[in-house]
Swiss-Prot record:
The gene is efp. This is Elongation factor P. One of its GO terms (cellular component) is cytoplasm. Involved in peptide bond synthesis. Alleviates ribosome stalling that occurs when 3 or more consecutive Pro residues or the sequence PPG is present in a protein, possibly by augmenting the peptidyl transferase activity of the ribosome. Modification of Lys-34 is required for alleviation. It comes from Sodalis glossinidius (strain morsitans). Belongs to the elongation factor P family.
Length: 188
């Protein structure tokens, strides 16, 4: 099995920790004035989604996680499972609500997603970085009303709620960054 040394740690690297695959979120190399250097690492467990911090001595070796990231097209949700299709061999995979998690609000039919598999089972779904969704509900923007923060909440077709500028109206399609949940622009 492949392994990584602490000097190879980077954000996004997937390693095994206590028999569970984890992804490195942050890696900080610390060299104190006295004593041995070490890496302070923030990890996200891929199965449970929990975030934890761990320190590794400089030069330690850690086993690489045997996970696969594959690009799939999101097809539909049947109420219990979200179905995805591999465009190369047309094989379909289903992921349950625990795997999809909060990313369900960003899944649009025919969107290219990344599915993370461990032992052949899906453990995480990553939606595209940007999605285009229609606004189904928002307050009407009053002309000249910019004394506040300049934003209002808007509900999208998937049920997600995003803060949008005052000039955006119901029925318009907007571009949203799925990593932060922020409004990016209107789609013409």
């Amino acid at each position: 099995m492949a392994s990584y040394s602490t000097n190879e740690f980077r954000s996004g690297l997937k390693i095994m920790l206590d028999g569970e695959p984890c992804a490195i979120i942050e890696n900080e190399f610390v060299k104190p004035g006295k004593g041995q250097a070490f890496n302070r690492v923030r990890l996200r467990k891929l199965v449970s989604g929990k975030v934890l911090e761990k320190t590794f001595k400089s030069g330690d070796s850690v086993e690489a996680a045997d996970v696969m990231d594959i690009n799939l097209t999101y097809l539909y949700n049947d109420g219990e499972f979200w179905h995805f299709m591999n465009n190369e061999n047309f094989e379909q995979l289903a992921a349950d609500a625990k795997v999809v998690g909060d990313n369900a609000k960003w899944l649009v039919e025919q969107a290219e997603c990344v599915l993370t598999l461990w032992n052949g089972q899906p453990i995480a779904v990553t939606p595209p970085n940007f999605v285009e969704l229609e606004i189904t509900e928002t307050d009407p923007g009053l002309k000249g009303d910019t004394a506040g923060t300049g934003g209002k909440p808007a509900t999208l077709t998937t049920g997600a709620v995003v803060k949008v500028p005052l000039f955006v109206q119901i029925g318009e399609v907007i571009k949203v960054d799925t990593r932060s949940g922020d409004y990016v622009s209107r789609v013409k």
